[in-house]
Amino acid sequence: MIEVQHIYKSFGNKEVLKDISTTFEDGKTNLIIGQSGAGKTVLMRTLVGLLEPTKGEVLYDGRNFVSMSKKDKILMRREMGMIFQGAALFDSLSVIENVRFPLDMFSNMTFRERQQRAQECLDRVNLTGAENKYPGEISGGMQKRVAIARAVVMNPKYLFCDEPNSGLDPKTSLVIDDLLSSITKEYHITTIINTHDMNSVMGIGENIIFICDGKKEWQGNKETVISSHNQKLNDLVFASDLFKKV
């Protein structure tokens, strides 16, 4: 389990995260939701150690990630898979080379083993046959699936996704949501997703943390989102595409 205890983060005089305490459940699809500028990305970057909190603790199974040595943090990050807003693929590498890249860098596997593992991950995201294509030759949705395959190639315990549906059409977004949800269950990964897409929230959200102006306003599951008595959350929900007339 990931526990966040009284996290603050400031940039100069601007306080971006304000006393956030929450938990992210093991083997579940955890969503951090909120409008743009709410602090979602700053919180996620703090969780993975790309930013140091001004104050507070981030605990992985009871171990304080913030106070770990540099060496221990590096080892800890190898248990994390990451998917960014853009697919962040290497244009000069083929699809299978992109997926294999973490193994090439950090594993002791033979080339044949690395290639086989990369192929397994591509098959899992339904990209069999695209191995030798380059990122510029495939669609944005396919690029996101390559990014997912790369993120899970080293069998991470935690999967962090920053706006994985950014720039995608609704149909493709649904495919990505379903893929992340099924991989979470199949591999028993603890998945944390930043999003402001209420379709994702209502589709795959098992543990939902709502952030507004750097503060945690509400936490629950998708079944209780609509019935929430939190006015700020209600405003976000009813302003979304879920309730817009066609």
Map each language-model feature to its residues.
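A short, proline-enriched helix->beta-strand linker immediately N-terminal to the Walker B motif
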Residues: V153-K157
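Helix N-cap at the start of a conserved alpha-helix in ABC-type nucleotide-binding domains
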Residues: P170-T172
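Conserved ABC transporter NBD signature motif
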Residues: G56-N64
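Conserved ABC ATPase "signature" region
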Residues: F111-G129
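Helix-to-loop junction immediately C-terminal to a conserved catalytic motif
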Residues: V48
